[in-house]
């Protein structure tokens, strides 16, 4: 996800209830255990089903997190005084920076300095972290080989761990799911007498009506790559990039791709969509009290609606509608982020690593501190119940059912496990054109070519 999720989500607030979804460290300071390089083996070592180093019972662990995940790491440290915990922050691999892989590559070269646990806001890191390279042992430990409690991984929502499952082994613990729903301002919908859209066609028609009757009000923004590409194109089942093993396809001629590009261009033209970045000062300045609705992931709860520095919503003002879909087609939606925790195969205290991973995703503080819909099924159920009982959301029962349903309708045709970030293509090709008043449609050839070039550079065969 998304990058913005990692970078900007603040710990949310819920009035009188459980809280909601919300300086790079140098490798020289990372005090993790280390071994000589080698490939992960199925024969196991030191009690684990892989080539683990000798375990040291009292060895401390280093946890590398972004600002949004620091609270859960601090909670673990407070609740486990018997474990020496060093918490260090970095950008969370946000925005396709590749900082996670860069740090691990440097540690591999030095043969020391690996963190014991790393948070990443991206969903594709298993493509490299679970694979040994140039004689170096794969960084990510297979969690199902003794790191986590037996059977614990079975508690995940179906499909949540698919992006980190490689050759039958699970290499990461998913923090949250980030399915896209339609967020609506109930206060404004009631005031204007509008009906909440159910389809993309409804959404476009509502944009026309809003532009004509209430100029200055909007139905969202595509000022960020993740809103346009992940929230909109993915939700539209637009196959602008798909992967099958090492085969890559960018299909901009598919009807779903063409329809969504036309929809976005149309709504930009009538100004029912803006180009404000959601985490820039312009967004709250221009959108607070004037945003009728927006398609977006579940972590918008804390990042936008319950963030005093953003929309600063009030109880009963915002609700979650069903995921938008094309008329006459099955419901499908996109996913924006929902990052993973990785344990290091080099750690000398894998017991503590496993305890942290389970604590962070399904422990006693996870409902309060996970910044989005938790990926662990029992935690997700408790989180949804907390939203309804907290009283913040309009139409609480609809909130619960619509968010839960969206989590089961994420479109599987998207290239979610792409080994490189898709964000630079939008940021460097499409966004500058839009800033000059050009259309998305006018950039399609260059946009597609950028994806194909990036794919080739990263070892894919372009089909």
Indicate where each model-derived feature is located.
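Extracytoplasmic/periplasmic substrate-recognition and gating elements
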Residues: 258, 267-272, 309-375
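C-terminal capping/gating helix-and-loop segments adjacent to ligand/active sites or protein-protein/ligand interfaces
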Residues: 335, 397-451
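Short, polar/charged alpha-helical segment
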Residues: 65-84, 88, 426
């Amino acid at each position: 996800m998304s990058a913005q999720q990692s970078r900007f989500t603040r710990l949310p607030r819920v009035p009188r209830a459980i809280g909601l979804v919300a300086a790079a460290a140098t490798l020289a300071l990372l005090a993790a255990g280390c071994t000589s390089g080698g490939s992960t083996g199925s024969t196991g070592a030191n009690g684990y089903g892989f080539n683990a180093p000798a375990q040291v019972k009292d060895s401390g662990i280093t946890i590398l997190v972004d600002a949004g995940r620091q609270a859960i790491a601090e909670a673990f440290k407070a609740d486990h005084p018997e474990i020496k915990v060093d918490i260090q922050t970095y950008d969370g691999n946000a925005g396709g920076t590749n900082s996670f892989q860069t740090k691990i590559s440097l540690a591999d070269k030095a043969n020391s300095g690996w963190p014991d646990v790393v948070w990443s806001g991206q969903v594709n890191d298993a493509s490299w972290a679970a694979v040994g390279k140039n004689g170096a042992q794969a960084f990510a430990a297979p969690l199902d080989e003794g790191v986590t409690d037996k059977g614990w991984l079975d508690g995940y929502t179906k499909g949540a761990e698919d992006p980190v499952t490689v050759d039958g082994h699970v290499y990461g613990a998913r923090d949250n799911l980030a399915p896209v729903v339609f967020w609506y301002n109930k206060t404004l919908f009631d005031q204007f007498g509008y009906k909440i859209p159910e389809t993309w066609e409804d959404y476009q028609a509502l944009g026309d009506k809003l532009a004509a009757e209430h100029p200055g009000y909007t139905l969202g923004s595509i000022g960020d790559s993740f809103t346009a590409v992940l929230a909109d194109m993915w939700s539209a089942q637009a196959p602008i990039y798909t992967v099958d093993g090492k085969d890559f396809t960018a299909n901009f001629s598919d009807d779903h791709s063409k329809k969504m590009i036309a929809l976005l261009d149309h709504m930009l033209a009538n100004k029912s969509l803006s180009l404000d970045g959601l985490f820039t000062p312009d967004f709250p300045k221009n959108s607070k009290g004037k945003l009728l609705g927006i398609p977006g992931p579940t972590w918008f709860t804390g990042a936008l609606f319950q963030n005093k520095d953003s929309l600063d919503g009030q109880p009963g003002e915002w609700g979650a509608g069903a995921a938008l879909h094309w008329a006459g087609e099955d419901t499908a939606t996109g996913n924006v982020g929902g990052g993973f925790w990785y344990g290091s195969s080099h750690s000398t205290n894998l017991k503590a690593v496993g305890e942290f991973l389970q604590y962070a995703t399904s422990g006693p503080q996870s409902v309060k501190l996970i910044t989005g819909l938790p990926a662990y099924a029992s935690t997700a159920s408790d989180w949804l119940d907390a939203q309804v009982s907290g009283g913040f959301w309009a139409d609480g029962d609809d909130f619960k059912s619509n968010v839960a349903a969206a989590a089961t309708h994420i479109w599987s045709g998207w290239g979610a496990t792409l080994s490189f970030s898709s964000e630079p293509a939008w940021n460097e090709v499409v966004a500058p054109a839009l800033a000059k008043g050009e259309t998305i449609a006018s950039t399609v050839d260059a946009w597609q070519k950028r994806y194909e070039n990036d794919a080739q550079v990263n070892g894919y065969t372009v089909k």
